[in-house]
Amino acid sequence: MAACFCFFLLAAMLAGCDVERRKSDAELGLNAQQAAGRRIYDDACDRCHEPYSSRDKKGPSMKGVFKHPYLAGSGLPANDARVGEIILYGRAKMPGFGQTLSQQQVNDLLAYMHTL
């Protein structure tokens, strides 16, 4: 009887919890290039740069990286050429990915980053 009560109590508590679910590419309205970039971001960037916060991450959040004329912290232009260069060659504590990502993958990644 006590086990039944505990089960129902736990079920009732969990029913009230909102579990954050990752949205699909379609729900985010991503095109094929942006979706490919999202997969690259998940594999190569997310360990240091969470899209929406930098909590417990080494690098800054990438949310809105292209919504401002200059990159936060460095004052460098926030454009595809400059951000692509940082992705390829790195900066300060960030390693470059020029040996692991093709130019097409960098372009896909930039397309996704524009959606953040």
Protein language model regions, located:
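The canonical Cys-X-X-Cys-His
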Residues: 37-51, 109-113
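Bacterial N-terminal signal peptides that target proteins for export
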Residues: 1-5
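C-terminal motif of bacterial Sec signal peptides marking the signal peptidase cleavage site
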Residues: 13-16
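Gly/Gly-Pro-rich "capping" loops immediately C-terminal to redox-active cysteine motifs
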Residues: 34-38, 50-85
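Inter-heme linker and motif-flanking segments adjacent to c-type heme-binding CXXCH motifs
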Residues: 20-23, 54-55, 115-116
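C-terminal capping alpha-helices of c-type cytochrome domains
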Residues: 33, 85-87, 92-93, 97-116
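Cys/His/Pro-rich metal-binding microdomains
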Residues: 46, 63, 95
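Electrostatic cytochrome c docking/interface patches
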Residues: 18-40
